[in-house]
């Protein structure tokens, strides 16, 4: 009985991030990062926070993680070969209507998450 319970628990937790699909990863010369992801509707804010906290981050730098609706069509090549974070933000601005969450890890290692559906005027959500 215990073995079956353990297997059930492990199989449920194994896919706790299955609704988060990595897309583009960009790192500039200073090791600031921008990552984009597609997410399904059932992914919660808590799951995104947990997932974001496990991503690679260089101490003293800034990491921004953009989580778009799974049916968004983000131009990954334009992002992958961008010259700067400013270029990436210009490209992503065109798709802000599909942006669900933004997660930011500041140089202090503090993680912040913004729900863009609840706060669309947030500067990180509208790319201003």
Where are these regions (language model features)?
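C-terminal motif of bacterial Sec signal peptides marking the signal peptidase cleavage site
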Residues: 8-11
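Bacterial signal peptide processing site
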Residues: 13-15
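Short, surface-exposed polybasic-aromatic patches that bind anionic ligands, especially phosphate groups
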Residues: 21-34
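Mature extracytoplasmic domains of secretory-pathway proteins
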Residues: 33, 37-99
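C-terminal partner/receptor-binding element of secreted or periplasmic proteins
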Residues: 89-128
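Sec-dependent signal peptide recognition
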Residues: 1-6
């Amino acid at each position: 009985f215990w073995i079956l319970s353990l297997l059930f628990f492990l199989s449920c937790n194994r896919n706790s991030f299955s609704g988060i699909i990595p897309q583009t990863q960009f790192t500039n010369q200073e090791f600031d990062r921008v990552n984009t992801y597609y997410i399904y509707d059932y992914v919660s804010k808590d799951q995104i926070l947990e997932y974001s906290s496990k991503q690679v981050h260089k101490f003293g730098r800034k990491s921004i993680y953009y989580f778009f609706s799974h049916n968004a069509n983000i131009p990954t090549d334009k992002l992958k070969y961008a010259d700067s974070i400013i270029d990436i933000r210009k490209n992503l601005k065109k798709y802000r209507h599909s942006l669900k969450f933004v997660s930011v890890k500041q140089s202090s290692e503090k993680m912040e998450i913004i729900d863009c559906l609840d706060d669309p005027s947030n500067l990180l959500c509208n790319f201003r």
